[in-house]
């Protein structure tokens, strides 16, 4: 399976960088989210947050490999 826009991922342990307090309660380990953008070079994904308008890469909340696992392609 490979990740793409629309895939469902489950968040795991978050990396060493602190997450913005506005998003910390929403993006907790074990929660599932829909991928908006995926960078095949870095494995970076972007997710949306309620009230956050995401229309292009760079607008979303970023997570890196090891911080998420693919649930549904």
Where are these regions (language model features)?
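Intrinsically disordered, low-complexity repeat segments enriched in small/polar residues
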Residues: 6-7, 11, 34-37, 65
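General beta-strand recognition
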Residues: 10, 44-46
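Short, exposed beta-strand/loop patches in secreted or surface proteins that constitute
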Residues: 1, 35-38, 61, 68-70
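Intrinsically disordered, low-complexity, charged/polar segments
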Residues: 46-73
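Short coil-to-beta transition motif at edge beta-strands of beta-rich domains
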Residues: 2-22
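Short beta-strand-centered aromatic/proline hotspots
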Residues: 21-38
């Amino acid at each position: 399976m490979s990740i793409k826009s629309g895939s469902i991922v489950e968040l795991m342990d978050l990396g060493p960088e602190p997450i913005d307090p506005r998003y910390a309660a929403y993006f907790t380990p074990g929660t599932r989210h829909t991928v908006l953008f995926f960078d095949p070079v870095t494995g970076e994904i972007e997710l949306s947050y309620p009230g956050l308008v995401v229309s292009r890469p760079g607008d979303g909340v970023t997570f890196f490999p090891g911080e998420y696992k693919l649930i549904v392609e």
